[in-house]
């Protein structure tokens, strides 16, 4: 059952949470770590418990990397289609974890997969969100050459989410890779144009421009920090906030 969290009022009514496929690997070298799935399902359940509507987009990098095989000679479109299928596999695994916790969930795919997932339908997705179901958007945008980050921003705009929350391995956006540069400094707040001008690599250009053009706030945070997701949703200042206006 969705866990009830008392005494904390959500700042956002509807969010779009973007998880990388790599996040699902946990301590494994490949695939899906069931312990990570269960932990993420618990954190999402906490949000549902306080009345937050949750849309999810999960990458596929834990199962397939189209870009790497494309560099080795595979046709890019074929590689991207295979990557889309990987995101469907991750979506099904996440749905299973949520339902085992008695959290109703629905997987929608941008590629028609009758009998496996529902086909993506914006109006149907919004109806399910309004009913308290977690909606998992898979297969990216359904088109090659678009990343799952772009898909996350697109779906967030389509379902009229209040914010895109991008879960990463670090607690925000830095001036450089903090794993490689010990002097890298973290930003608490950035504008879309600053991200583009500084080439910070938060998301690809298409995703950032989508957010900028539709004034969709984006927050980057560390999913491995316990309670970070809930803290953001109730108004905490985790990670880095990217939005329009002055930094």
Swiss-Prot record:
The lineage of its organism: Bacteria, Pseudomonadati, Pseudomonadota, Gammaproteobacteria, Pseudomonadales. This is Uridylate kinase. The keyword Calcium does not apply. The keyword Magnesium does not apply. It is found in: Cytoplasm. Its EC number is 2.7.4.22. It is an enzyme of class 2 (transferase). GO terms for molecular function: ATP binding; UMP kinase activity. It comes from Pseudomonas putida (strain ATCC 47054 / DSM 6125 / CFBP 8728 / NCIMB 11950 / KT2440). UMP binds at residues 60, 80, 141-148. Pfam families: AA_kinase. Belongs to the UMP kinase family. Gene3D superfamilies: Acetylglutamate kinase-like. PANTHER family: URIDYLATE KINASE, URIDYLATE KINASE PUMPKIN, CHLOROPLASTIC. Inhibited by UTP. CDD domains: AAK_UMPK-PyrH-Ec. Keywords: ATP-binding, Cytoplasm, Kinase, Nucleotide-binding, Pyrimidine biosynthesis, Transferase. One of its GO terms (biological process) is 'de novo' CTP biosynthetic process. It catalyses: UMP + ATP = UDP + ADP. InterPro entries: AceGlu_kinase-like_sf, Asp/Glu/Uridylate_kinase, Uridylate_kinase, Uridylate_kinase_bac. NCBIfam families: pyrH_bact (TIGR02075). Its main location: cytoplasm. GO terms for cellular component: cytosol. Catalyzes the reversible phosphorylation of UMP to UDP. Pathway: Pyrimidine metabolism; CTP biosynthesis via de novo pathway; UDP from UMP (UMPK route): step 1/1.
